[in-house]
């Protein structure tokens, strides 16, 4: 059987036809056009998915299901998206809307969750039963795979790992709490620390790298200087890794996965991040004499959303 996988982002919708092994047979995309409202976007999601089959030369008779990954939360009990900030969606009945365009079963989940599923089917965690996917971008997102299946919890929020508190009474988070993990382990955290550094040391190499414009600092700027041995950026990066490892340790204690996969923008520095995490993690895991999760880098990158969404329908 074949599956339609659809990756919905704030800027584009990507669809692919995927086989049982997670191979993409055909894919194409279109702009999201969020400003048109959810009805028009969902119509395009459906039409793009269905046209993917037609353009691939395959038949709809071969397709078992449609899977959709969204940058928000999906309530599996009701078929409603309670909120999805990037799409400006609130209480959107996506399953009912999709029924206007197809009789195929439709499955929807968070985009980080489907990326984790993709890695467990076709990527670095393939062959494992229990794995976690952690995406390090503007915030921190996650996907939980237990016994080879997506685990989203009773209310669809089991993978909102970025909002577990790792620093009691810490920095305020956009969610309203203080001390959330993503305030310390995201790309945004590196940018914030870089801006503080430049404000305190206007002549530092980081300030020179961005031509004196603090607003232009990126996580990559900070990491690049750390990789080149700049003392201040090394300090920032080491502190970042510490907070990342604290959160990973909590996840290991709760889920005991075989593999934790790191994705997102920060992970693009590759072995520099991976080696730092692997070096520090043994100091914080609880059972130091027993095996614990190995940490790896995501391998599927841009195709993970399509593959993982498609695999939602395989279960």
Can you annotate each of these PLM segments?
Residues 108-112:
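Short loop/edge segments at beta-strand edges and connector loops
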Residues 81-90:
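Conserved phosphate-binding/catalytic loop of the ribokinase/pfkB sugar-kinase fold
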Residues 144-160:
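Short, charged low-complexity linear segments at domain edges
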Residues 7, 67-71, 133-139, 143-145:
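Short beta-strand segments
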Residues 1-65, 75-78, 95-106, 118-128, ...:
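ATP-binding/phosphotransfer module of carbohydrate and carboxylate kinases, centering on a glycine-rich
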Residues 31-34, 89, 158-160:
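A short acidic/small-residue loop/turn micro-motif
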Residues 11, 114, 138-141, 161, ...:
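Conserved A3 ("GATE") glycine/threonine-rich loop of ANL adenylate-forming enzymes
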Residues 28-30, 85, 154:
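Short hydrophobic alpha-helix segments
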């Amino acid at each position: 059987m074949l599956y339609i996988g659809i990756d919905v982002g704030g800027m584009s919708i990507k669809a692919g036809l995927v086989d049982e092994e997670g191979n993409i047979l055909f894919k194409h995309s279109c702009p999201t056009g969020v400003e048109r409202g959810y009805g028009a976007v969902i119509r395009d999601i459906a039409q793009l998915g269905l046209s993917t089959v037609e353009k691939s030369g395959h038949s709809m008779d071969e397709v078992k299901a449609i899977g959709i990954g969204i940058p928000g939360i999906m309530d599996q009990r009701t078929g409603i998206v309670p909120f999805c900030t990037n799409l400006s969606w609130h209480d959107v009945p996506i399953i009912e809307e999709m029924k206007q365009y197809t009789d195929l079963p439709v499955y929807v989940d968070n985009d980080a969750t489907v990326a984790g599923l993709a890695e467990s089917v076709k990527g670095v965690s393939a062959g494992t039963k229990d794995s976690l996917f952690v995406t390090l971008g503007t915030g921190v997102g996650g996907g939980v795979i237990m016994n080879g299946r997506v685990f989203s919890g009773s209310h669809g929020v089991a993978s909102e790992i970025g909002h577990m508190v790792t620093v009691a009474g810490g920095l305020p988070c956009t969610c309203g709490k203080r001390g959330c993990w993503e305030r310390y382990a995201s790309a945004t955290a590196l940018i914030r620390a870089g801006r503080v550094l430049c404000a305190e040391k206007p002549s530092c190499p980081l300030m020179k790298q961005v031509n004196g414009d603090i607003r232009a600092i990126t996580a990559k700027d900070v990491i690049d200087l750390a990789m080149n041995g700049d003392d201040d950026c090394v300090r920032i990066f080491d502190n970042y890794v510490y907070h990342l490892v604290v959160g990973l340790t909590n996840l290991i204690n709760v889920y005991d996965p075989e593999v934790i996969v790191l994705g997102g923008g920060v992970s693009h520095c590759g072995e520099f991040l991976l080696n730092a995490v692997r070096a520090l993690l043994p100091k914080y895991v609880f059972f130091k004499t027993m095996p614990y999760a190995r940490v790896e880098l995501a391998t599927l990158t841009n195709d993970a959303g399509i593959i993982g969404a498609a695999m939602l329908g395989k279960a």
